[in-house]
Amino acid sequence: MKRIGIWLLLTAMVIPLLAGCSAPETPAAQTENKGKSYFTYFDTVSYVYSYAGDSAEQFDRRSAGASGILGEYHRLFDIYHEYSGENNLCTLNRNAGGESIEVDRKLIDFLVYAKELYETTDGKMNVMMGSVLSIWHDLRTAAGDDPASARIPTDEELQTAGEHTDISSLEIDEENCTVRISDPDASIDVGALGKGYATEMAARWLEADGAFGYVLNVGGNIRIVGTKPDGSGWVTGVKDPANTEKFAVKLMLADTSCVTSGSYERYYTVDGVRYHHIIDEATLFPADYYSSLTVVIKDSALADALSTALFCMPYEDGAALAESLGAEVLWIFPDGEIRYTPGMEKLIAN
């Protein structure tokens, strides 16, 4: 962990611009913006910033509190490692097909919410896609190590894995705080939801503590708590998928969340074709409707889930779902066309 004083977010998919983050002024005096970065959560860099003129002691306490929450959920959501005295998603996956396992109430609440989102998104946000996602993940990793041997999954591999993605295999006993995966070949993967959910929990803790004028950036998931002292927001850039050194659109945001999913970040190439990491549950292949999709809504967990679910939906279906949930969305199509909801248009910065 290190203390930082300016925004250095050059690898994020959604990036607060330096021009939008100059030190605000309070009626009394100029205040120093404060920030800390953390490198241990969700395999990415996380940032906590304050523009509220907090004392150093108050900022240290609040940033430590937010960091602690991110760390707690990082451990709960980890599908690769178990931790002493704690049953997490890795524990559940390794015991698939076995007996029910007692878990922390926080993990119960999360999994219940995940199942609700499955219904809300008509199955496009499915945390039981682990059997399929792991195949693509392993092949993408192998291609990075040896590009000459890169391949895509066979139809047989995907069809077999696709038989083990039934959300009903995730059995939750809320009263007794236990979870069971009934299918021994099924597994949980919360890559489309976990980071946003953890970010939202950290933001709610900050809000309950009276924080205002804070910004969380957890690997590109932006959650803003309040506004700058003068009541203004932050200018946030959405990368141009065709040239990621530039911005396709700039947004002015305050007291909300912003999450982008894109086909240009995690991918590998086979025979000149790019295969990215956002897998459509209907085809078991990377979704090809859009190059980039940005969601703005206050709840970071919902923003995270929708950025994946809508990426896997035709435009008309996605627009209808976004409207029903009060989410603002910006779609960038493979040919460069940009569409957005009426509310998103109001957020576009001049």
What feature does the model see in each segment?
Residues K2-L10, V14-N350:
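Mature catalytic core of soluble alpha/beta enzymes
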